Amino acid sequence: MIKFNMVFSKQAKSNYKYWFLCLMNKRELFLLGSIFILTACSSPKVSTTVSLQEPVLQLLDVYEIPFQTMFQQTKVGGLSSIDYNLEEDVYYLISDDRSAFNPARYYKASIRIRHNKIEDITFISADTLRRYDGSMFPSFANDPFQCPDPESLRFLSTTNQFIWANEGERLINHEKPILLDPAIYISNQNGQVSDSFKIPSIFKMNPGEKGPRRNGTFESLSLNKHLNMLYACMEEPLFEDGERAGLHDSTAWVRMIKFDIETKDPVIQYAYKIDPVVHKPNPENAFRVNGVSEILYAGNKRMIVVERSWSAGQKPSNVKIYLADHAVASDVSSIKSLTVGGFIPVTKKLLIDMDKLGIHIDNIEGVTFGPRLLNGNPSMLFVSDNNFNKGQVSQLLFFELKNFSE
């Protein structure tokens, strides 16, 4: 946020009447000007400093949840989102366990913060995600056509409900193609689905190169300040919108969608350009990806965007945090392919490249605003998904957001 703070002396603020100046001859004007200059020079020093303050993310603390932590007979891991309930001072974290280790679920937890440090995290409950009929979601082994892929969860305090994203599935080389459309569900306090948002047909799975890519759909969700709009963002481009992020290109577009909470209808779509993949994979032709792993509404039509890049044979991931602005972005709902151009995209500005923190950064997939710090600045917490992998960690990163106006 740019702030201007300009202070002038009283002489600089004087407003001479136009008619008075008109009565003066050139000599009088010259003498008056000389007096003005001398008076200004003899007055106290004038500050004309322009303060240009950009938002800054400063790391305060890092906390790791031990590998294979067990709670209520569930394996804690795969934490793919985090959301803060200010009234109860608790957090909700969804697991992307596809009912493989334990039934699909989310956790309620208390995170104790003192002196800008995370003292500990205490899990309060593990709540199972359930289908419309109240039954649990099956594992891939039991029913690959109904197995969920939970990725993001937000708490809707106005109705005490949860909104969560299911990435769906697209396996066309299976003995029988498995196509499960991505979905955004609304669940009650017991985790049971009661409703869902209306997903435009362009986001439906297809056996051909059309629609979403596998594991590239709704990875991120966020509610606006007034809790009447929901934002969702694709992790990767639709087939129609062009190639995935490459090593050196910057032509990959993903779609950000705004939904009406009351009607569940899509309202508008925006185009957001993701960065190239950061590191070359090893070997060079191995898998690589960069995409949006989470978003967080930040007020005034701005969004915190988490971009995560990963390459086979390299360190776990590179994570960059952007402040995106869609105030003047075009509605691309009617554009069938973003490769044609002719639209105004969401703008973005880098807040932090976590590579430069000098610490191990794992697979960051969740972000939320936390409690206000004592100095009044917002705090932010990020969480990483360890993929239930011993070589990865479930991290909580605690940040202060400076120079930020909501």
Locate predicted features.
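Sequence/structural signature of beta-propeller domains
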Residues: 42-406
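Arg/Lys-rich, positively charged N-terminal/basic patches that mediate binding to nucleic acids
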Residues: 2-19
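Short linear sequence elements within intrinsically disordered, low-complexity coil regions
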Residues: 13, 21-23, 35, 89, ...
